[in-house]
């Protein structure tokens, strides 16, 4: 475990779990709330980590312009990780919401701002009482504009940093990269029982760790 004997930390590749040869969810079902499928034409995708993915996914499936969401893992080493494997801290993945959106209805900037305002991006390897590298803050971009979008996300985060500092909060630790530049280079969907979890389990665990500090969208 990456934090068994001290503070959470990422593990070296030689110590990471080996994972599996096949996806844990090879045939995703239609979205339980939106009724949609992955891979819709005319859409774009952003991968967002803001702590426990159950509540985070609900936040985004309720966002106008978002046409599909799923939960899974990215940013780490282990291929095709299970939820239990990721919870050991030995995959280096973080919990992620895949957000597929119609860019004519909601913008990339708006989704980044929503993500930043919905959690505390200064907490490092935790969110509230949820501790571990799998809860770290992250934004991963994808598609032909991934590099430009990653740079734009950094600009938004840099715009937010002094506002958080003025509120007495620390340095932003959000990891921002094109998904293809992460160690595994992929997003791995979690098991079906985790998809749209709070729709299936309305009384399920749903922490919110917003700082209450507005971010806003800086000029491009």
Swiss-Prot record:
It comes from the Bacteria. Its EC number is 1.8.4.11. Keywords: Oxidoreductase. GO terms for biological process: cellular response to oxidative stress; protein modification process. InterPro entries: Met_Sox_Rdtase_MsrA_dom, Met_Sox_Rdtase_MsrA_sf, MsrA_MetSO_reductase. It catalyses: L-methionyl-[protein] + [thioredoxin]-disulfide + H2O = L-methionyl-(S)-S-oxide-[protein] + [thioredoxin]-dithiol; [thioredoxin]-disulfide + L-methionine + H2O = L-methionine (S)-S-oxide + [thioredoxin]-dithiol. The keyword Oxidoreductase applies. GO terms for cellular component: cytoplasm. Gene3D superfamilies: Peptide methionine sulphoxide reductase MsrA. The active site is at residue 52. One of its GO terms (molecular function) is L-methionine-(S)-S-oxide reductase activity. SUPFAM superfamilies: Peptide methionine sulfoxide reductase. Has an important function as a repair enzyme for proteins that have been inactivated by oxidation. Catalyzes the reversible oxidation-reduction of methionine sulfoxide in proteins to methionine. Belongs to the MsrA Met sulfoxide reductase family. This is Peptide methionine sulfoxide reductase MsrA.
